[in-house]
Amino acid sequence: MNTTDSLKTVNEWTNKSVERMTSFGELNVRLFEKLAARQMDAVNLYMDHSMRLMKLATESKGYNDLFKGQVDATKELSERVMAESKATMQFFGDARDEYRVWFEKSLNDVSEDLRKSVAV
């Protein structure tokens, strides 16, 4: 292997490394966007709950109606939060799998490149 071949190999490794880091960045951005959307959904969930409680406070005919409405609203909120929590755990499981696939593919690519370089 002469100097030209060595430089060519280093250039190929550099280009492939940049491609891998770009794909890693794209994966991070995609997952961040999904997570940000989930967080906005959670904020909206609490805003809806707050609006419901405010409406209940202004429209209740008495303390019993207010208390019963608060209990019902809180129960519904708890159920929705639990469902969102389960969906979020599923999201993180999927994200873990996507990272694992990316890592395994990148590791295989690096191993293949090293084998090619040693064989030359």
UniProtKB/Swiss-Prot annotation:
Q: Which InterPro entries match?
A: Phasin
The identity of this protein, by name, is Uncharacterized protein Alvin_0065
- Species this chain originates from: Allochromatium vinosum (strain ATCC 17899 / DSM 180 / NBRC 103801 / NCIMB 10441 / D)
Q: Which Pfam family, any one of them, does this sequence belong to?
A: Phasin_2
